[in-house]
Amino acid sequence: MSIFRFKRFEVINDRSAMKVNTDGVLLGAAMTVNPSDRMLLDVGTGTGTIALMAAQRWFDLARNENVGSRETGMPESLKITAIDIDEISVEEAARNFANSPWHENLQAQHASLDEFSVSLQGEGSGEKFDLIFSNPPYFDESLLAPEQRRCNARHTSTGLSYRELLEFAAEHLSDGGRISMVLPAETEAALTRHARMNGLHLFRILRVRTVPRKSPSRIIAEFSRHRCDEPEDVILTIQNEGKYSEEYLSLTHDFYLFA
């Protein structure tokens, strides 16, 4: 059995279509999480890693804000729903959730984003999310991966697109809600344009580069309903002079064993 060990939880990493990866961990560590958040949605959860990171961060914040007295206490205070179109990934995520300290707050569901949206409408609950997050597929033009499940996890032509995510967010975010995504840097212009078309505005962007001499290859972009004239704009360098940078180690300190 392949197990990826973080400081406070473990992830079974055997069968999911998308394994634990740097992009996902960066999103989980860097996205904005508030102690006032109650309803969170992970779209394309894979192993469930980002949802687990969100749970850990929320309970740390809540404890500091005196929202809850125990790490697994007040289960009604936080609900994280994690969906994926791949049934095997959902089974693995559910197992990882069950083995975590926050198992009462995490739920894995086998559904596409469209199916999940329809189910929300069918329930008539008017449920809104304070945070939606995703590490969506991004290989629009590349050759399709040979294995179909991994193909769906990596390619927008067969799976989820950021356009769908933004359109869903426009309908299902709470008034103060945010959507956070990790994507290739070259998608920035189209991403922000499509967000504006859906009434969403960039308030924070983290530009990720592997080493100082290279241009950013990834962005973590965060949007809300509220206009922001000067979005927070930060550059993160992963490695410097052959070792992990201090800023990267600081960002991932609560998760990676080596940080």
Regions found by a protein language model. Give the residues of each.
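Conserved SAM/SAH cofactor-binding pocket of Class I
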Residues: 29-125, 131-145
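SAM-dependent Rossmann-like transferase core, predominantly class I methyltransferases
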Residues: 2-39, 45-58, 222, 237
